[in-house]
Swiss-Prot record:
Domain S1-like, first and last residues per copy: 1-72
Function: One of the essential components for the initiation of protein synthesis. Stabilizes the binding of IF-2 and IF-3 on the 30S subunit to which N-formylmethionyl-tRNA(fMet) subsequently binds. Helps modulate mRNA selection, yielding the 30S pre-initiation complex (PIC). Upon addition of the 50S ribosomal subunit IF-1, IF-2 and IF-3 are released leaving the mature 70S translation initiation complex.
Family under the similarity heading: Belongs to the IF-1 family.
Protein name: Translation initiation factor IF-1 2
Organism domain of life: Bacteria
Cellular localisation: Cytoplasm
Recorded GO MF terms: ribosome binding; rRNA binding; translation initiation factor activity
């Protein structure tokens, strides 16, 4: 499938599910299950319930998607705290 065929939508994470999946409600009200994209997983980007995200979906299955971006809100109530790194 070509990358041009994918649909990008904005949404909000409602619930964190097992196996690094998330229940996301899109701006149009549609609910789907999404997983984090590879680059987000590689860079250890954390997604919490209530975060605004961009979801990429296939036009053939609109019930599943991939989270490709987490939007940072300027007036966020939770401060940014980097993850602790332990020497191995």
């Amino acid at each position: 499938m070509a990358k041009e065929e994918l649909i990008e939508m904005q949404g909000k994470v409602d619930e964190i599910l097992p196996d690094s999946r998330f229940r996301v409600t899109l701006d149009n009200g549609h609910i789907l299950v999404a997983y984090t994209g590879g680059k987000m997983r590689k860079n250890h980007i954390r997604i919490l319930a209530g975060d605004k995200v961009t979801v990429e979906m296939s036009p053939y299955d609109l019930a599943k998607g991939r989270i490709i971006f987490r939007h940072i809100e300027a007036s966020s109530s939770r401060p940014f705290k980097p993850a602790k790194r332990f020497a191995r």
